[in-house]
């Protein structure tokens, strides 16, 4: 440790053997703060103690994110539901869109935990699920809206629900698959990085986009739209008139 010339300050350096963003490094910040607080109380010090450095900064950021991100998730999903309700004129289709995208996110989180935590013995960096949620919600919604609006166009042209689904898949399914392969493959190139965090981000985003574009959008979404039938397009009357005038 270092002592200031006036004897009022002491600086101690603690070196951990893990990456700054790892959970173990940030856990060491909490342990150090608790130990200093207990020692100060026992010794009766009238002094302040601070734990600083990259892990401490990241720990504080992680703490704020953990406490607020759940509300952000809810707010974003409510906003997206409202926008999709206005765009599609349907009560249930926006719910189906959000559910299928979250399905891809949940599958990816499970695979990420399996591969990195259980197989490779690494920790899943706390920021990876946040990045995954934000980017998948944007990219996955693009693919979903592209297919759903094509189905909607078929309904407006007078197709039955199943014929509209088949027509939409024939017109847009290949485009969605190609875009997913390009985007997913691009993210997967991060696996060659030497950084565990970049590897996890690349794997998570690449896997999620491939699952969404190769499985969820071409198969799960049409299957659910088939099961929902005409309920897919039930919505406010004024929006139904705007989007094609389907009857109840």
Predicted regions and their residues:
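Re-entrant/interfacial helical elements at transmembrane boundaries that shape
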Residues: 11, 98, 132, 145-152, ...
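Hydrophobic, glycine/alanine-rich multi-pass transmembrane helices and their short helix-loop junctions
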Residues: 81-85, 137, 170-234
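Hydrophobic transmembrane alpha-helices and their membrane-interface caps
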Residues: 93-148, 225
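Membrane-proximal cytoplasmic C-terminal regulatory module of class A 7TM GPCRs
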Residues: 226-248
């Amino acid at each position: 440790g270092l002592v200031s010339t006036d004897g009022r300050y002491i600086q101690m350096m603690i070196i951990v053997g893990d990456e700054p963003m790892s959970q173990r490094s940030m856990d060491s910040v909490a342990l150090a703060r608790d130990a200093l607080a207990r020692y100060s109380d026992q010794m009766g010090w009238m002094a302040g103690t601070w734990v600083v450095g990259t892990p401490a900064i990241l720990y504080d950021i992680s703490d704020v994110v953990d406490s607020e991100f759940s509300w952000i998730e809810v707010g974003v999903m409510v906003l997206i539901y409202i926008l999709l309700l206005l765009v599609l004129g349907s009560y249930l289709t926006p719910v189906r869109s959000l559910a299928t995208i979250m399905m891809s996110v949940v599958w990816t989180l499970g695979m990420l935990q399996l591969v990195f935590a259980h197989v490779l013995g690494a920790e899943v960096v706390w920021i990876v699920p946040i990045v995954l949620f934000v980017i998948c919600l944007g990219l996955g919604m693009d693919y979903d809206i592209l297919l759903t609006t094509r189905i909607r166009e078929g309904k407006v042209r007078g197709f039955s629900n199943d014929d509209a689904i088949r027509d939409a898949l024939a017109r847009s399914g290949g485009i969605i698959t190609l875009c997913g392969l390009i985007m997913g493959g691009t993210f997967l190139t991060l696996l060659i990085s030497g950084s565990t965090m970049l590897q996890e981000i690349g794997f998570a985003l690449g896997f999620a986009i491939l699952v969404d574009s190769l499985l969820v959008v071409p198969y799960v979404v049409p299957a659910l739209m088939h099961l929902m039938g005409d309920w897919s397009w039930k919505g406010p009357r004024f929006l139904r008139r705007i989007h094609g005038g389907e009857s109840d």
